[in-house]
Amino acid sequence: FPYTTLFRSTGIVTTTDNGGSTGRIRQEQGGIAWGDLRNCLNQIIIEPSTASALFEYRFTGEGELSGHNLGNLMLKALEDMHIRPIEAINLIRELLKVKSHIIPMSEEPVHLAASLGSGSSIVGEVSIDNLTELPQSLFLVPMVKAAQEAIQALEQAEVILLGPGSFMTSIMPPLLLPELATALRNSKAKVIFIDNLGVEIGAASQLSLADRIQKINEIVGAPVIDGAIIPYREQSAVDLSAISPIKILAKRLNADDISYRHDRTLLAQAIDELVGELDYE
């Protein structure tokens, strides 16, 4: 059986967003960042429904609600009712009939920060996304505890996927939590990096595949990546000697309607193929 259909999938999601509707809610009400969690739930809905359309509804007009996403407000309301973020997500999962599990990297409010070459620091994903130079390092403010369920998911995983997503603001933040870095470092699972289909906007665009893999390994404290899935058109640009002995699988992965978005079926097939090759070695 294919790995992607045989096993239960669990997503560990970054909670450092401070832009858009999420940023406004955090600035005015505090709490964790719900935007990426909401978006992940929406992306894995198999059967669209009135409930899923309601969850993704975004207010328009000129009032205070303009630009706010109803799903963000629903999750924030559950948080204000003193419901654990993970339990709040599970309630929405049941409403949307989502089978996959979604876990925040932490259940405590946290922001992403960066140290710059000038010696100064900036705080916030929005500021980091707007950088034109690569930061010297990334760190969390304040340092928080990882969600226990996230640690357990890594410890029990048979395959761990990193990406796709914004490298500095989506993939890296969970790895900055010592408990998650340790769990990944000690894991016996096959670890696969999934590259983006398009070039990132901002400083992250300066990083090659080898650079990104090296930064992950540095943060985790060990060479943890076993394989990488990349767009077939980029395979000629990859310096294989720089990432050896990592197994590279280059495939057509883009959706027909949006060139920079992965097609679910094609990506699942690529994951199955690469896991099979890694298991055979």
Which residues are covered by each model-predicted region?
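Conserved phosphate- and dinucleotide-binding cores of soluble alpha/beta proteins
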Residues: 8, 13-30, 131-132, 147, ...
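Electropositive, gly/pro-rich neighborhoods at or near active sites that engage anionic ligands
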Residues: 16-131, 272-276
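C-terminal functional extensions of proteins
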Residues: 206-281
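Internal active-site segments that recognize and position negatively charged phosphoryl groups
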Residues: 113, 117-178
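Non-transmembrane, aqueous-exposed alpha-helical and coiled segments at domain scale
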Residues: 108, 183, 197-199, 258, ...
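Short, small-residue-biased leader/transition segments that mark boundaries at the very start
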Residues: 3-6
